[in-house]
Structures are given as structure tokens and as C-alpha cells.
Regions:
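A domain-level signal for the structural core that forms small-molecule/cofactor-binding pockets
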Residues: 2-64
Length: 64
């Protein structure tokens, strides 16, 4: 059973996340030749204050 973990910065809507889960499930099932019902997708939303880019938090970069 494939387990896919995705980490994204928080702020996307439920529909966007549902579409992401659906599209990733379809791609994994097709490419690994497994039933879509066996694919697990975990989406972790990370606060921008906890997401670092170039030594600074994404939140601080957005304020600049």
C-alpha cells in the first residue's frame, strides 16, 4: 500500500486539498499499477512561521 506524504504551507482551501489528494491518488495508482483504494495520501499543512526559506521564515519573507 503506497503512502504519500505531502507538506504544504497552510492557507489552501478544502477543495484544493481534496483535488490534490484525488490527483495524487490517481497518478500513484496508475504509475504503480495498484488499486486507488490502496493509496494513502497524507497532507500536512505547515504554518508559514514554521516554514524556512534561505534562513528566514516564510511569514517574515511575506512581510518584506
Amino acid at each position: 500500500m503506497p503512502i504519500i506524504q505531502i507538506q504544504i504551507i497552510e492557507g489552501r482551501g478544502r477543495e484544493q486539498i481534496q483535488n490534490l489528494i484525488s490527483d495524487v491518488t490517481e497518478a500513484v495508482a496508475k504509475n504503480l499499477d495498484v488499486d486507488a483504494g490502496l493509496v494513502r495520501v497524507l497532507v500536512n499543512e505547515i504554518p508559514s512561521s514554521h516554514w524556512g526559506v534561505g534562513g528566514k521564515s516564510k511569514a517574515s519573507l511575506e512581510k518584506s
